[in-house]
Amino acid sequence: MPTITSYFGFLLAASTITPALLIGLNKIRLI
């Protein structure tokens, strides 16, 4: 079932990218 695999892949990517974006925004604000 590729739909479930792509769904979990999307969740994994989102959970990895979101914190990175938040850290990047915090670093930009500190500058």
Swiss-Prot record:
Cell compartment(s), UniProt: Plastid, Chloroplast thylakoid membrane
GO biological process, one term: photosynthesis
Principal location: plastid
Topology within the bilayer: Single-pass membrane protein
InterPro entries (alphabetical): Cyt_b6/f_cplx_su6
A single Gene Ontology CC term: chloroplast thylakoid membrane
Keywords, ordered alphabetically: Chloroplast, Electron transport, Membrane, Photosynthesis, Plastid, Thylakoid, Transmembrane, Transmembrane helix, Transport
Transmembrane segments: 4-26
Molecular functions per Gene Ontology: electron transporter, transferring electrons within cytochrome b6/f complex of photosystem II activity
Pfam families registered for this protein in UniProt: PetL
PANTHER family tied to this protein: CYTOCHROME B6-F COMPLEX SUBUNIT 6
Protein family: Belongs to the PetL family.
HAMAP family linked: Cytb6_f_PetL (MF_00433)
Its biological purpose: Component of the cytochrome b6-f complex, which mediates electron transfer between photosystem II (PSII) and photosystem I (PSI), cyclic electron flow around PSI, and state transitions. PetL is important for photoautotrophic growth as well as for electron transfer efficiency and stability of the cytochrome b6-f complex.
Subunit annotation: The 4 large subunits of the cytochrome b6-f complex are cytochrome b6, subunit IV (17 kDa polypeptide, PetD), cytochrome f and the Rieske protein, while the 4 small subunits are PetG, PetL, PetM and PetN. The complex functions as a dimer.
Name of the protein described by the UniProt record: Cytochrome b6-f complex subunit 6
Organism: Calycanthus floridus var. glaucus
GN (gene name): petL
